[in-house]
Amino acid sequence: MTRYTYLFILQIISCSFAATWVKITKPTITWEDMEVSLEGEKKFFCGEFDSSFTGRYHWRFNGSSILPERTQIHRNQFVFLAGANAIRNQLPGEYECCVRETLGNACYSRMIVVQNRTDNHNIDMTNSTLLLADEGNTYYIRMHDVKRVEGVKCTLDGVNVDNFKYPFLGRQTKKTVPYHLKIENIERGGEVNCDLRLHKKEIVQKTFDIRLLRGFISSSQLPQFVYLIVFTIIGYILRL
């Protein structure tokens, strides 16, 4: 058997196998409309026809078996874990689950779309101690009126966090930089304490608080939300 004959036979087998699977498109899901459990999770079901099916479920994301971060599979449920909203820009796409039911082999496909996508913001906090942030956004923060910074080390409520970083590469540290801290895909609020390492190992400190603006605000909630923000700001002014 020649190499080309072998490849031809494999192609026929592959096509025959693929033909036994039927793709069924389910309604699109909007991320913001999904219910959130008490544990902060969002989930959806495979949607198979046979509700008594107890076999294996094969899940794919955009055609790949590599699933997004902060997700889990519970048989016929795809679960977005608490904290997934902070990385929601990574989640839109096609989700498929394939099952071998008694009616036949089927792949149930649905799209998830995100309307309120995250964004990047540049913030000057040289004269501020409060950052009002939207969950999932990335913030570049200027903390002091200094020209050269060799690095920064920060804690959130006393704990080191991976998404608090110095936003520039080592070869750039000798240049004047406008921002000293990058908070990537911000997840939660709290008290931030930072040490900025300047030229000749001089250290300056910066302390500020992060408060998250949670979710969407309906028109009925808007007055209460405005009052909350106003009183929060007044409270911080009185503490200065």
Swiss-Prot record:
This protein's membrane topology, according to the annotation, is:
Single-pass membrane protein
Membrane-spanning ranges: 215-235
Record-level GO cellular component terms: membrane
Name this protein carries in UniProt: Uncharacterized protein ZK512.1
Q: What is its main location?
A: membrane
Q: What is the lineage of its organism?
A: Eukaryota, Metazoa, Ecdysozoa, Nematoda, Chromadorea
Q: Where in the cell is it found?
A: Membrane
- Which positions carry the signal peptide feature in this UniProt record? 1-18
Which branch of life, at top level?
A: Eukaryota
Q: Which UniProt keywords apply?
A: Glycoprotein, Membrane, Signal, Transmembrane, Transmembrane helix
- Species of origin reads Caenorhabditis elegans
Glycosylation, residue list: 127
